[in-house]
Amino acid sequence: MTKQLVPPQIPQEFLPRHIALVMDGNGRWATNRGLKRTEGHKRGEAVLLDMVDACIAMGIPYLSAYAFSTENWRRSTDEVRFLMGFNRDVLRRQRDALNAKGVRVRWVGRRPRLWRSVIRELEAAEELTKDNTTMTLAMCVNYGGRAEIVDAAREIARRSAVGTLRPEEITEDSFTQFLDEPDMPDVDLFLRPSGEKRTSNFLLWQSAYAEMVYQNKLFPDYTPEDLFAAVEEYALRDRRFGGTK
């Protein structure tokens, strides 16, 4: 990001604390231009960094980016291989820059099937940035919302079976502590470019009362101004959380 960002003037109390971002449309963007699908993913790297800068400019403390889902293993072997290497290399290339900006990187997702080299880079980024406080970037790699809930339920069942957790102790708050990143707040703004209107199994528990904003623009074409527009729309929403005002 080289140009000066001019975020909208929105009072802090009307800003989302946590944005969930589905980085959708990379493959279609490339196909529309007669390029390999991998070229769309490469372009998406720069766009994600722009989104981090935009969040910092607005004072939004949490951004969760859907980088690779548990369902993405169904893609072609070549594309999966590329995405594994690409996620590894993005972290390797960008962790120092993210650290310099005060960004704390967190990994959300499952270990099974994930390349060891990807895990090493995720853990290295977490360790390098663990004390940063400007904002938190959750890289959701090998992540699925249902898988996360199932994993949490299994751990609760295991503890109940050995007598360390009583049924009456299982509440929404205590259940949250068994999720992949329990210290992050619930999602306020669920953002999906590309024109598609679905959650795609992303942060299901955390997005129970998220405001959904769908924008008809493929992710490689997405700009900070598009993110600003989504936040402005969010700020105008009347969030009642099931109640009335």
From Swiss-Prot:
<keyword id="KW-0808">Transferase</keyword>
<keyword id="KW-0479">Metal-binding</keyword>
<dbReference type="Pfam" id="PF01255">
    <property type="entry name" value="Prenyltransf"/>
</dbReference>
<feature type="binding site">
    <location>
        <position position="211"/>
    </location>
    <ligand>
        <name>Mg(2+)</name>
    </ligand>
</feature>
<dbReference type="GO" id="GO:0005829">
    <property type="term" value="C:cytosol"/>
</dbReference>
<feature type="binding site">
    <location>
        <position position="192"/>
    </location>
    <ligand>
        <name>substrate</name>
    </ligand>
</feature>
<dbReference type="GO" id="GO:0005886">
    <property type="term" value="C:plasma membrane"/>
</dbReference>
<comment type="function">
    <text>Catalyzes the condensation of isopentenyl diphosphate (IPP) with allylic pyrophosphates generating different type of terpenoids.</text>
</comment>
<feature type="binding site">
    <location>
        <position position="37"/>
    </location>
    <ligand>
        <name>substrate</name>
    </ligand>
</feature>
<dbReference type="GO" id="GO:0030145">
    <property type="term" value="F:manganese ion binding"/>
</dbReference>
<dbReference type="InterPro" id="IPR036424">
    <property type="entry name" value="UPP_synth-like_sf"/>
</dbReference>
<protein>
    <recommendedName>
        <fullName>Isoprenyl transferase 2</fullName>
        <ecNumber>2.5.1.-</ecNumber>
    </recommendedName>
</protein>
<dbReference type="GO" id="GO:0033850">
    <property type="term" value="F:Z-farnesyl diphosphate synthase activity"/>
</dbReference>
<feature type="binding site">
    <location>
        <position position="75"/>
    </location>
    <ligand>
        <name>substrate</name>
    </ligand>
</feature>
<keyword id="KW-0460">Magnesium</keyword>
<dbReference type="InterPro" id="IPR001441">
    <property type="entry name" value="UPP_synth-like"/>
</dbReference>
<feature type="binding site">
    <location>
        <position position="73"/>
    </location>
    <ligand>
        <name>substrate</name>
    </ligand>
</feature>
<feature type="active site" description="Proton acceptor">
    <location>
        <position position="72"/>
    </location>
</feature>
<feature type="binding site">
    <location>
        <position position="41"/>
    </location>
    <ligand>
        <name>substrate</name>
    </ligand>
</feature>
<dbReference type="GO" id="GO:0016094">
    <property type="term" value="P:polyprenol biosynthetic process"/>
</dbReference>
<feature type="binding site">
    <location>
        <begin position="25"/>
        <end position="28"/>
    </location>
    <ligand>
        <name>substrate</name>
    </ligand>
</feature>
<feature type="active site">
    <location>
        <position position="24"/>
    </location>
</feature>
<feature type="binding site">
    <location>
        <begin position="69"/>
        <end position="71"/>
    </location>
    <ligand>
        <name>substrate</name>
    </ligand>
</feature>
<feature type="binding site">
    <location>
        <begin position="198"/>
        <end position="200"/>
    </location>
    <ligand>
        <name>substrate</name>
    </ligand>
</feature>
<dbReference type="InterPro" id="IPR018520">
    <property type="entry name" value="UPP_synth-like_CS"/>
</dbReference>
<dbReference type="GO" id="GO:0008834">
    <property type="term" value="F:ditrans,polycis-undecaprenyl-diphosphate synthase [(2E,6E)-farnesyl-diphosphate specific] activity"/>
</dbReference>
<comment type="similarity">
    <text>Belongs to the UPP synthase family.</text>
</comment>
<feature type="binding site">
    <location>
        <position position="24"/>
    </location>
    <ligand>
        <name>Mg(2+)</name>
    </ligand>
</feature>
<feature type="binding site">
    <location>
        <position position="29"/>
    </location>
    <ligand>
        <name>substrate</name>
    </ligand>
</feature>
<comment type="subunit">
    <text>Homodimer.</text>
</comment>
<dbReference type="GO" id="GO:0000287">
    <property type="term" value="F:magnesium ion binding"/>
</dbReference>
